[in-house]
Regions:
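Phosphate-group recognition and catalysis centered on beta-loop-alpha active-site segments
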Residues: 1-255
């Protein structure tokens, strides 16, 4: 059974051009920016700090009510903004009327691109959930990225995102995020392979606690870079070094 799945992996997922994806292996990525010490995750301050430290940036992105791609992880504002509002039910202007503890407001993707300005690479995780129209989000991401020359990639747990970029923006580097625990959508072996075949990604971003495993080993052998998250300790940093190509890290997991 496993040999059949491996053959199907090779059939559905082509090896990416090393010239397109090689840069992914060369960086440590700050998970949601370089947060801590008063800097909030996914905030302008966290992104500025990551750039200053020469770290790549991983960020989260979801859609506002008026279809702006907003940089924010949680579906609601309670944890970080002290509001019970849902992000998808509020316009960009309503998002930006709220403030983090440091006084800054959430930003959209265009504002993040201005902060980064090509100085470090950017990993953009597109948020999704059941019955969510990811196509609308993907279109706005492409609009925001038009003309941006800095290294960047789009990724998601939802294989529809990578598949959409393959079809509609094939030069955008695209990845599939995966985990195997109870919080993931790919707990079973067959579900992981089905997601891989649907996504047809250029790279994987795999949960560090699931390493090592056969899928990651096969992907690296086939030329797909494998990033791993969230690396939050020296021990996990060593695991990432052994079994993946680059870490998405925070706190004590950063170099």
């Amino acid at each position: 059974m496993r040999s059949l799945l491996s053959r199907l992996d090779r059939f559905f997922v082509a090896s990416p051009d090393p010239a397109r994806v090689g840069w992914l292996r060369e960086w440590t990525y700050a998970h949601r920016g370089l947060h801590g010490e008063g800097r909030v995750e996914n905030s302008p301050a966290a992104f500025r700090a990551a750039v200053e430290e020469g770290l790549g940036i991983e960020c989260d992105l979801q859609r506002s009510l008026d279809d702006w791609p907003m940089v924010f992880h949680d579906w609601d504002f309670a944890r970080l903004l002290g509001s019970t509002d849902q992000g998808e039910r509020r316009t960009r202007a309503q998002w930006q009327a709220l403030h983090y503890a440091d006084g800054e407001a959430p930003i959209d993707l265009a504002a993040l691109l201005e902060i980064v300005a090509g100085r470090v690479p950017l990993l953009i995780e597109v948020k999704s959930k059941p019955r969510y129209d990811v196509t609308r989000t993907c279109r706005r991401v492409v609009d925001a990225l038009e003309g941006y020359a800095g290294p960047h990639a789009v990724m998601s747990f939802d294989p529809r995102v990578s598949r959409w970029f393959k079809q509609h923006s094939p030069m955008t580097v695209r990845g599939l995020v995966m985990r195997e625990d109870s919080k993931g959508h790919t707990q079973s072996e067959i579900s992981r392979h089905l997601a891989l075949w649907a996504a047809q990604p250029d790279f994987l971003a795999y949960h560090v606690h699931a390493l090592p495993n056969r899928m990651v080993t096969a992907a690296r052998t086939a030329g797909l870079p494998v990033l791993t998250w969230t690396v939050s300790s020296p021990d996990l940093r060593e695991r990432a070094r052994q079994y993946a190509d680059a870490p998405i890290a925070e706190g004590a997991g950063l170099p």
